[in-house]
């Protein structure tokens, strides 16, 4: 995680929001009586595998192209070592899901170590933890097998182990190894698997679905990278929407995300061509998403395919009777998640290692069906899926993938929600501040995706604009139930969308927290359960605010969307002390990236005089006053 540092262009005094006396400042008076309820799960995460945020990102498996998956397999990331060559072998399948394996052809006069290497996803992050590797091998061989992690350019070894293994040409056998490592200075590390060339000379060996894991979050098998999971945990989000997003839709009905192909052993998962230009291994599958929720204390929000592929791909949308097999598939998925072991799919879940049903309460039907030709048919499709799911699971909250009335049934079913997405310019987000004041309050809202766009990195102007937008929906969080910034994660080496909340490379600890990350963290970690009335002698703009309470604690969130300092008095009867957290920079274009960290929050303890706090808010600033 990036350490706190001084902000450029703002003095340390301003950073700490030094107390000032200014009779002409803006006055905010927070009522301690009454108020509207605020959703307890307001802030959370939207995740799909974009920007190698899953494979190569938060998913712990580090080898790229581990199983040569897909109908057009290739040797991306693989290379030969020593007196040998490698090739794709489609005649020695590992399983029906993994029809191709790597054939290692060893020279007749081979000596020394021969084998194969994998470069990972633009490197391998060796962090000094214990590593675990597994692989399948077929071919007549009895001898040493060595697994090493070695510097790509330096040859420095960061960890290794050697085992003795016997395999035959008849069947694949699996081997697993564990070994300690020392921390590498960067991600330029290769995975190397070798056999004794003098023993294997003149023969060939096949290798299938190789894996490499370091320590995982909460030691989950096939789990998450702790470095990224910890950063998310620091935000204290409340929910996780998965698996997308566009990556749920796919480019055709056949290419959609298929839940039943993401479960079981890794060698039984065929993977799929993802929507964001690269193949998904689906090692991060249905079980792993629910364990992610369990381990970070998140409410799962499951997206299901609803007969519409991205941009009407593959002759979708499907309607009428053509939807029946896909509705049945969703019902099977829900039985897998929620059914006890007396049910067909609940028993299958238990056989895959999860005896107890998961606690799923929310399902979203489709993704952005207002786009790409989906709107006209969505009312029919939503109703068909809603009716079937609600009949079988009446307690589930079902969410429409759009809030646009033209795409929805004339009357939404009681208890259903709608999903509102907003990617916009900074001024566009600020312009939406009042949008949520005027909602039909009988239909709850999920803001499933939002952020500033059309820039490489979140900057202060955009992050303050997002804060204004967030203040707008938090003021209305009796009807706005959940909201998530998107996209969440970004491997710097392979990016399909910017800006993103959190960036990283494969160098250990190389994580870049954006200005927008800090806004999300500040707002999520400081939440009340009741939104309080605030009276002021000023209109909204350029200063925006919202106040909430939880018991005797009060939270006032502020955003200064402008270039002038704002002097403030904030009155909260009965309070005496508070903590001020501020993110600010006088340059609206200031940003954090992989090459610089210019803007981080600062905190100070402040005292009230008769329940009144007096301070100044710098230009282009987001602040939270937590008082009691």
UniProtKB/Swiss-Prot annotation:
Keyword hit for Membrane: no
Signal peptide coordinates: 1-25
Keywords (A to Z) from UniProt: Glycoprotein, Glycosidase, Hydrolase, Signal
PANTHER family with a match to the protein in the record: ALPHA-L-ARABINOFURANOSIDASE 1 (PTHR31776:SF0)
GO molecular function terms noted in the UniProt entry: alpha-L-arabinofuranosidase activity
Catalytic activity: Hydrolysis of terminal non-reducing alpha-L-arabinofuranoside residues in alpha-L-arabinosides
Higher taxonomy: Eukaryota, Fungi, Dikarya, Ascomycota, Pezizomycotina
Protein's job: Acts only on small linear 1,5-alpha-linked L-arabinofuranosyl oligosaccharides.
Organism: Aspergillus niger
Glycosylated position list: 36, 51, 74, 152, 171, 260, 359, 440, 493, 610
Assigned protein family: Belongs to the glycosyl hydrolase 51 family.
GO annotation terms (biological process): arabinan catabolic process; L-arabinose metabolic process
Pathway: Glycan metabolism; L-arabinan degradation
Top-level EC class: hydrolase
Domain of life: Eukaryota
E.C. no: 3.2.1.55
Descriptive protein name: Alpha-L-arabinofuranosidase A
Gene name of the record: abfA
SMART domains recorded: Alpha-L-AF_C (SM00813)
Transmembrane spans: none
């Amino acid at each position: 995680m990036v350490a706190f540092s001084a902000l450029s262009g703002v003095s340390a005094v301003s950073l700490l929001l030094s107390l000032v006396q200014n009779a002409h400042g803006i006055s905010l008076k927070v009522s301690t009586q009454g108020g509207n309820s605020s959703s307890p799960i307001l802030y959370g995460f939207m995740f799909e595998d974009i920007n190698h945020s899953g494979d190569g990102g938060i998913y712990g498996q580090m080898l790229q192209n581990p199983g040569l998956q897909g109908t057009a397999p290739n040797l991306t990331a693989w290379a030969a070592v020593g007196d040998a060559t490698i090739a794709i072998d489609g005649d020695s399948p590992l399983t029906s899901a993994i029809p191709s394996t790597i054939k290692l052809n060893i020279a007749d006069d081979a000596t020394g170590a021969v084998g194969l290497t994998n470069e990972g996803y633009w490197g391998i992050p060796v962090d000094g933890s214990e590593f675990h590797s597994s692989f399948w091998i077929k071919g007549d061989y009895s001898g040493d097998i060595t697994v090493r992690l070695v510097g790509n350019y330096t040859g420095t070894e960061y960890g290794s182990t050697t085992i003795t293994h016997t395999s035959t040409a008849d069947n694949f056998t699996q081997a697993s190894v564990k070994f300690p490592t020392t921390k590498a200075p960067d991600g330029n590390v290769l995975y190397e698997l070798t056999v004794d060339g003098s023993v294997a000379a003149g023969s060939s060996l096949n290798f299938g679905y190789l894996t490499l894991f370091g320590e995982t979050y909460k030691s989950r098998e096939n789990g998450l990278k702790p470095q990224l999971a910890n950063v998310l945990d620091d935000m204290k989000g409340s929910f996780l929407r998965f698996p997308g997003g566009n990556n749920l839709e796919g480019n055709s009905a056949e290419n959609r995300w298929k839940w039943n192909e993401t479960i079981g052993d890794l060698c039984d998962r065929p993977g799929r061509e993802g929507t964001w230009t690269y193949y998904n291994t689906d090692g991060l599958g249905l079980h792993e998403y629910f364990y992610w929720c369990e381990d970070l204390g998140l409410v799962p929000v499951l997206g299901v395919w609803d007969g519409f592929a991205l941009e009407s791909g593959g002759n979708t949308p499907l309607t009428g009777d053509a939807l029946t097999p896909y509705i049945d598939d969703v019902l099977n998925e829900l039985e897998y998640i929620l059914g006890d072991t007396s049910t067909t799919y609940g028993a299958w879940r238990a056989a895959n290692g999860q005896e107890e049903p998961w606690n799923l309460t929310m399902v979203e039907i489709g993704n952005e069906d207002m786009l790409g030709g989906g709107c006209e048919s969505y009312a029919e499709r939503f109703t068909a899926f809603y009716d079937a799911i609600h009949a079988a699971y009446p307690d589930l909250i079902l969410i429409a993938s759009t809030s646009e009335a033209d795409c929805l049934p004339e009357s939404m079913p009681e208890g259903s929600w709608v999903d509102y997405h907003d990617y916009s310019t900074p001024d566009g987000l600020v312009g939406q501040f009042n949008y949520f004041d005027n909602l039909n309050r009988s239909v709850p809202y999920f803001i499933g995706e939002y952020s500033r766009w059309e820039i490489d990195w979140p900057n202060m102007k955009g992050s303050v604009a997002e804060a204004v937008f967030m203040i707008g929906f938090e003021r209305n969080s009796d009807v706005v139930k959940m909201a998530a910034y998107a996209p969440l994660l970004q491997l710097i080496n392979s990016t399909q969308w910017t800006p993103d909340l959190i960036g990283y490379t494969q160098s250990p600890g190389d994580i870049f927290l954006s200005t927008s990350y800090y806004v999300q963290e500040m707002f999520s970690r400081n939440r009340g359960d009741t939104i309080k009335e605030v009276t002021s002698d000023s209109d909204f703009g350029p200063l925006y605010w919202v106040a909430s309470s939880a018991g005797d604690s009060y939270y006032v969130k502020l955003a200064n969307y402008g270039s002038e300092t704002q002097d403030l008095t904030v009155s909260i009867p009965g309070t005496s002390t508070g903590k001020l957290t501020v993110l600010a920079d006088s340059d609206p274009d200031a940003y954090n990236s992989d090459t610089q960290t210019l803007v981080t929050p600062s905190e100070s303890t402040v005292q009230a005089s008769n329940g009144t706090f007096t301070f100044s808010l710098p230009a282009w600033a987001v602040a939270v006053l937590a008082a009691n």
